[in-house]
Amino acid sequence: MRSKLRALHVTCALFAAGISAPATAEWLLDADGGVLYDSNLNRAYKSADIRADGAFTLSAAGGSHFALSGADGLTLTANARSEIYHRFHGLNLLGLGGTALYRHKFGLGYAAPWILLVASASHDNYRDDIRDSDRVELRAEIGKRFTEAFDAAFGGRLERRYAKNDEAVVPGISGKVFDLRGQSAYARAGYAVSDQLLLGIELAVRRGDVVATTRRDFQIFVVSDAIAPDPTFGSDFVAYRLRGTTDTAKLTASWAFDNRSSLNFAYANERTDATGGIVYRSHSANLVYAWRY
C-alpha cells in the first residue's frame, strides 16, 4: 500500500507516471489548485523595501506516458499555470509550456536505483510586461529507494530565461533584467510515515543571475549588469540584475485522500549572497490540492 501511496505523491508533484509493462500509451491529466505566501517577493535586502504577498495558484497538465520497455518510461505533457496576487497585481501570471520526462530503472524491485532526465520549456505572460519571458530548463536526477518507506535522490538543474522586454534607463547598461541563467544542485529525501502521510526534505544551492527590486540604491547599482524600472512594486522601485548564490532548505508534507488526490504543503527558507555584499532572505509557503485522472 505504501508503494502505491508514494507513486501517487510523486505523480502529483512531477506529472510523471511509474514504469509499467504494456507498451501502449497511458493518458495523464493533472489539476492543482492552492495558495502561496512569500515574505520577500521582490528580493530586497533593506527592510523598508521588502514586500510580501499571497496568491491563488492554478495549474493543469495533460499528456501521455509511454512504457518504452520494462525499465524505461517517457512522459510527455503540455501544461498551463496561473498565479493571481492579492496586492501586487503586476505579478499576475499565465504560463504555457511543455515537459518531456525520461526515467530509467536499473533493475527490478523497489530498491533498484533510477535516473531521471527532464526537459521543459514555457512562455510566461505577466500583467506587468517587464517580466514576460520564455524559459528553458534541463534537469537530471539519480535516486534510490532504500526501504518501502524511504527514498533519496540528488540532481542538478540548468536554467535559462529569455526576457522579452528591454527598457534601458542607464546608457550602456542593459534593460533586460529578467534575462537570466543559472545552475543548481540539490539533494532530497522522502519518508512515508503511514499509508497516507509522506514527509520530505530538500537542500539546494544555486549559482547564477538573480533579480532584486528596491528603491534606487547606489550600493546595488554599481554591481548590477542590468537595470530597469519595476512599476509592479511602486513608481520609485527599480529592478537590478546581479550574480548571486542562493541556498534553499525546503520541508514538504503530503496527505493522500485516495488513489487520485492529495493535499500538499511546502515551506522554503532561502538566503541569497550576491555581488557587492548584498544579502537577502525570503520565506515562502504553499498549500496545494492535487488531483490526477
Q: Where are these predicted regions, by residue range?
A:
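Short glycine/proline- and aromatic-enriched beta-strand/turn motifs that initiate or cap beta-hairpins
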Residues: 25-67, 83
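Repeated loop/turn-to-beta-strand initiation elements of outer-membrane beta-barrel proteins
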Residues: 70-74, 107-115, 146-154, 195-201, ...
